[in-house]
Amino acid sequence: MRTKYSFYNFLVSLITSVALPIFGFIKVRMFIDLYGSDLNGLQLTIMNVITFLNVFELSYSLAFRQLLFKPLAENDRDRVLSIYNGAVKVFRFTGMAVLIVGALTALLFPMFAESPLGYGETVTMFLILCVPFGLSYFLMGPNFVIIADQKEYKINIWIQTIAILRMVLMVGVILMKLPYIYIFLIEGLQVFIANFIARRIALKNYPWLKENKQLPYDDAFQKNAKYTIIQRLSTLATNNTDNLVITFFMGYTMTSVYGSYSYLTESVSKIINSAITSPINSFGNLFNDSGADSYSVFTEFFNFAVYIASIIGVCIFVVIGRF
């Protein structure tokens, strides 16, 4: 079953990891031709800032899933509910904090670099993209349960379908030469709709998450989350600061140029990650199976992942100059 779930997760991720960049290349080229490089750079920079504001999502996901692996493997619903109820309280508090900090950041963001838009328009664009991420914290609890139970493909296929539909709609907006605000609205709505649908699917598969049992809240999630937040922040500081530095010193136009060229490497990275990260939750289940030879299986997979990544890395190094 672990192999089957890993394969399903990989297949869904791989298809969309290939399809989305194709639409993305078309969309970026058309967006720049119609609205200009500076507006494209503005959008890229806003998304980078929001990535830092949204640091808790991936951190919480990892911390929450780690706690759920064992009770899910043992089918201990009361333990899952106890962890879930404790985590949901933190999610809601964090969602409110992200919305408040996002609003304050939006007011200050136009001062970061010279914007192609007026002050009010820049703040509005930031809020349109930021608010859905804050609201997503009120929806994401059940999503992490289905992911931890190795069935991410059930929600991911819908999330990625919406992402592809988003790209198609954006291309349509550009072809009709509608105002750029529609692009930002589509981007923001996609985040909220994807999380809402994923939540509905997760609750349909785990209706007992809605049970109002008088179980004590488990605070283990809060203890684990603080470590994963630090880990996630270090990753963001390494990989997501380029655009911010370029914008601050060189402006939004150069950010657009840099973002267009880095799009290729980011797309290849997502394809590799789809293969490497798909079995993660299955490994979590495996490590909680006392009868499984988990160490040897993990070692074989790790060696295979390093081998594939090395080959692809060398190929990119050779051809990136010509690109």
Segment roles from a protein language model:
Residues 1-6, 180-181, 196-240, 244, ...:
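Interhelical loop/hinge segments that connect adjacent transmembrane helices in multipass membrane
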Residues 18, 88-114, 128, 168-176, ...:
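Alpha-helical transmembrane segments of multi-pass membrane transport and lipid-handling proteins
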Residues 58-74, 147-148, 206-207, 261, ...:
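Helix-loop junctions and terminal segments of transmembrane helices
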Residues 3-7, 133-159, 171, 181:
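Membrane-interface junctions at transmembrane-helix termini in multi-pass inner-membrane proteins
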Residues 1-24, 41, 78-85, 120-122, ...:
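N-terminal membrane topogenesis motif
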Residues 104-107, 116-139, 156, 160, ...:
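Alpha-helical transmembrane segments of multi-pass membrane proteins
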Residues 16, 123, 127, 156-204, ...:
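Hydrophobic alpha-helical transmembrane segments
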